Amino acid sequence: MAISFNSIPSDTRVPLFYAEMDNSAANTARDSGASLLIGHASNDASIAVNSLVLVSSVDYARQICGAGSQLARMVGAYRKTDPFGELYVIAVPESTGAAATVALTVTGEATETGTVNVYTGRTRVQAPVTSGDDAAAVAVSIKDAVNANPDLPFTATSEAGVVTLTARHKGLYGNEIPVTLNYYGFGGGEVLPAGVNITVASGVKGAGAPALNDAVAAMGDEPFDYIGLPFNDTASVNTMATEMNDSSGRWSYVRQLYGHVYTAKTGTLSELVAAGDQFNLQHITMAGYEKDTQTPADELAASRTARAAVFIRNDPARPTQTGELVDMLPAPKGKRFTTTEQQTLLSHGVATAYVESGVLRIQRDITTYRKNAYGVADNSYLDSETLHTSAYVLRRLKSVITSKYGRHKLANDGTRFGSGQAIVTPAVIRGELGSTYRQMEREGIVENFDLFQQHLIVERNANNSNRLDVLFPPDYVNQLRVFAVLNQFRLQYSEEAA
């Protein structure tokens, strides 16, 4: 018998017709992991800590995580950009330490009726002021307006003309929740009522970061291609890097889960450079934003994760540059990084963003990887798209091999077996890999097929006759990053003048 059947026996005697199904040549699916956000829920929230929870909507996140909680805000920021993708969250216990505070000190007496516009992160709070209100009355109005919105990252108290905003959770993250007055300024109709003066100053510095080991354990072996991490301290980033590593982590040959971590940090140029220099991790993207960016760092991380998910799901090799971080408020004009400063950040492993017409957009999603094991400059893992493309290619190969050859026999090239037999040889697999490469070339994932074929090696293992060894040398397509023009102008071509 030449044809290999899976179920129909070769010695059946009962008439007549038998058929079995075989889907090994039908699979055209593309494997992709979901998104994951890690963060704090309210202390009285119903969500179980360190457990994977599927979140379908912002309202559901508010319900189970608590309004105003870090996770609820991150889900809200994520869904602004990716309203469709599959999203999970893991709530981590609040760290020991201190909750960050911000003080708004009110002075003067209102000589006109108006509104105080306080921005806590991206959200504007409007506190009414009546002519004749003194500092204490204005402070109470601000406090009441803040507490009337349960979705804010702060709660408020007031005393003797001073409003104290306290972050809902303890930890370093609270130091990166911006508070300002009149973000849009006079041109946007935001001015303080005459006679009222308000100063904004940092109070207690947030301290502490959660231990993420149990959260990592909760991830198990579920695939997550896009992981949003709000904690940018060294210990938290290194914990996630261990989970992602190539030896025993998600990128190892044993687990083959892949994925990429996105985090964010706001600060001065020197602060961001110092942060980038701490790491050399190809599976981590740390995006740096100006200190005056009017969006909390945790929401920036969630938004960038969402943008990557939307773009990379469609095409892993296409650059994420220009991607809009929907509804994220950038730093105001005059307080944004210059091109020179952006170049510095990108040279120190910090991903960048830019602003066009008031919209915050991705400039370049690099990883923190900069040097090889000897400390020599290495750009092999510079761009996150390279990692996403690698995951796509490896999953594609796995899909082809496991779908078509999951129960095949292995023989040497030149073996004279009958057509229809479930047997592969190195040459058969080589042809299959070449065909798959051609398909990916047409899809714009790889290039240079002829050179790929020249360097491709498929051979039977000399010590294990059941094993095929493959050297698979793809040439990934690249991204258009720089368009350089030498404008060699003339006042008039001499030929024309003649």
Task: Mark where each language-model region is.
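Structured, hydrophobic secondary-structure cores that serve as assembly/anchoring elements
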Residues: 1-86, 322-327, 331-344, 349-498
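Threonine/glycine-rich low-complexity segments that form extended coil/beta-edge repetitive scaffolds
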Residues: 20-21, 25-69, 79-140, 169-223
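A glycine-rich, acidic short-motif signal
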Residues: 65-81, 91-93, 187-327
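Short, ordered beta-strand-loop transition motifs
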Residues: 96, 109-111, 156-164, 460-467
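Second-shell loop/turn segments in exported
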Residues: 125-133, 230, 418-422
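Amphipathic, non-transmembrane alpha-helical segments in extracytoplasmic/periplasmic proteins
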Residues: 137-150, 435
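Short beta-strand-centered interaction patches in the first periplasmic/extracellular domains
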Residues: 146, 152-181
